[in-house]
């Protein structure tokens, strides 16, 4: 429990606290945290991840209101089903539980998605690059989903 809390919440919060003062002093900065779909839609049987990810997102939302007048924005970008090495690793574990190979589990998940494909790291990176730039100075306190339309609602 303690290690998980440290990894998911306390370490990111400490990093933000160490860097945001410099951003405020420069009257410009961007804090962009990586979230997950669980921020808005808890995943079954994943209580700790759901709780900690939502907690970090709410911390970011609160901080956003405190630092926006100093030229600092704070956002969370939450990917779902982006094809990475981690996605491949979890497919191997989940597939094995179902008697499937990693490739079969990946294909099953891909076909089940609304987009009919996994997101690419570039899909995620494009949003992060925009939020980090000068044209996103009024965009703060949000949880941005990169999910191929998989969200059950508008949030």
Residue positions per predicted region:
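Catalytic loop of short-chain dehydrogenase/reductase
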Residues: 24, 30-56, 60-69, 81-82
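Short C-terminal tail/terminal secondary-structure segment
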Residues: 41, 129, 140-155
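Short, small/polar-rich loop/turn modules that mediate ligand/substrate recognition or access, typified
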Residues: 68, 73, 139-141
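Short, flexible catalytic-loop segment of classical short-chain dehydrogenase/reductase
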Residues: 40, 74, 79-89, 93-95
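A conserved structural motif in NAD(P)-dependent oxidoreductases
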Residues: 101, 113-124
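Catalytic Tyr-X3-Lys loop
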Residues: 1-14, 32, 49, 56
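A short, exposed helix-loop element centered on a Lys and neighboring polar residues
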Residues: 16-17, 61
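Conserved catalytic-site loops of classical short-chain dehydrogenases/reductases
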Residues: 2, 29-34, 72-75
């Amino acid at each position: 429990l303690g290690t998980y809390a440290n990894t998911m919440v306390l370490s990111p919060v400490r990093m933000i606290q160490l860097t945001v003062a410099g951003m405020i002093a420069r009257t410009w900065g961007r804090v962009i945290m990586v979230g997950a779909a669980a921020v808005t839609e808890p995943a079954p049987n994943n209580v700790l991840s759901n709780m900690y990810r939502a907690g970090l997102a709410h911390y970011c939302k609160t901080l956003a209101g405190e630092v926006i007048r100093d030229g600092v924005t704070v956002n969370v970008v939450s990917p779902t089903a982006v094809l990475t090495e981690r996605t491949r690793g979890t497919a191997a574990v989940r597939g094995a539980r179902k008697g499937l190979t990693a490739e079969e589990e990946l294909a099953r998940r891909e076909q089940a998605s609304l987009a009919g494909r996994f997101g690419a790291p570039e899909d995620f990176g494009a949003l992060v690059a925009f939020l980090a730039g000068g044209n996103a100075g009024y965009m703060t306190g949000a949880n941005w989903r990169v999910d191929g339309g998989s969200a059950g609602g508008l949030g």
